């Protein structure tokens, strides 16, 4: 499923995006964010993260840098005395 989602994103990026123009207010662009989210978190979580990102895509949101969150398995697992585990 991830492979199919990534192929659809590539199709959008190379066929439709040039006609629409670069209008993304975020870095990385929404299509790159979606690809990374799918590859990092799998199909369902990647779709969820992408949907959350697309919901923020409107004129009243300032945009900016919005990286894909790290997968829990790659986040550190030690406990901090004041903040607990993260």
Curated annotation (Swiss-Prot):
Query: A Pfam family for this UniProt protein?
Result: YidD
Q: Where in the cell is it found?
A: Cell inner membrane
Membrane disposition: Peripheral membrane protein
Choose one Gene Ontology CC annotation of this protein and give it.
plasma membrane
Task: List keywords of the entry alphabetically.
Answer: Cell inner membrane, Cell membrane, Membrane
Major subcellular site = membrane
HAMAP family, per the entry: UPF0161_YidD (MF_00386)
What protein family is recorded?
A: Belongs to the UPF0161 family.
* Function per UniProt: Could be involved in insertion of integral membrane proteins into the membrane.
Identification of the protein by name: Putative membrane protein insertion efficiency factor
What lineage is on file?
Answer: Bacteria, Pseudomonadati, Pseudomonadota, Gammaproteobacteria, Cellvibrionales
